[in-house]
Amino acid sequence: MTSPRVVIGAPLYNKAGHLPEALDSLLAQTYRDFALVLIDDGSTDATLAVAERAAAADPRVHVTRNERRLGMLGNTRRAFDLPTTMFPAAEYWALASDHDVWHPRWLETLVGLLDADPGIVLAYPLTRRIDEHGRPYANAKPPWRFDSRGCTDPRARMRLAFRRMAAGDMIYGLFRVSALAAVGTYRPVLVPDRLLLSELALRGTFAQADEVLWERRFRGLAELERQKQAFFLDGAPAYTHLPWWLQHAGAFAWAYAVRGEGASLGIGRRAGARLALDYLDVSLRHRLWRRARRLRGRAIRARDAALGPPVRAALAVPAVRTVVRRRVVPALGAAEETLGRLVAEAEREGAGDDR
């Protein structure tokens, strides 16, 4: 079996309605040297039949069905392990969903970025969010931008990636297999994509193509309780009741300070312990920034709501105006100034969005 340069792993589960469009867009890529491995996790709808029809029509498509359900975490891991085992000479790997849409030049563009610079370990495009019917959201935020090319210090890249990444978009980019294999894909924690990308940042840079080449059928953020159910079919481990960022810091400590997994990067166990502390530090700063931003927003909304007609009528009384001017306004101003300073300090550190 000739090995393609690119392998794509797609974990499938009960998305028969959107899967045909997803497969059509993947198989319409202008860059054609790839294999697509579809892994069904025991779907109860027509998902498997859709996948098998695609395999019958295109020799690049391969289909398998898990003997038992693995859940989202296990099936995503298998979506890396199986394609790279089937095609061990593959240089690049991508994770594909069973419900999104890819522009025909998506793969061509990302392969070009990785080919141009061996220091890049992940390439991804700008993302457009679409609804269940494929329509772009009218009130969607502008595409998230993050590119770490030019950042040469591994620890600085890790901190930068944590603050600025849009993990839910970037995880569907194109990875350099050698770098991803060294990290080991998803660890058994909640929000594993953020941890994976933080670890991967130690091994190289992230490059973003400056055009929208992927449409994400946005289904809302995955609540942590739902993640526990989808990831751990036999019951969530006790440590998943900890905040996800503490789980990540613990995983960093175990991997790099105890097991010495950073040896290939010249990161000893003592430096690995510092990495775990770095991760914990940037996590706490990020949470502080988000909390300060929320509090500032509430203060501004409360202030604006307070300027309604009843308050304006009260302010027509000179004595009320005097009290408000001397006592209320200075107190509100001091609170807003403090929150504004916290937000500004965090933004100078590069705090990002949790998309």
Give the positions of each predicted feature.
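C-terminal subregions of glycosyltransferases and related glycan-biosynthesis enzymes
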Residues: 153, 157-169, 177-178, 184-355
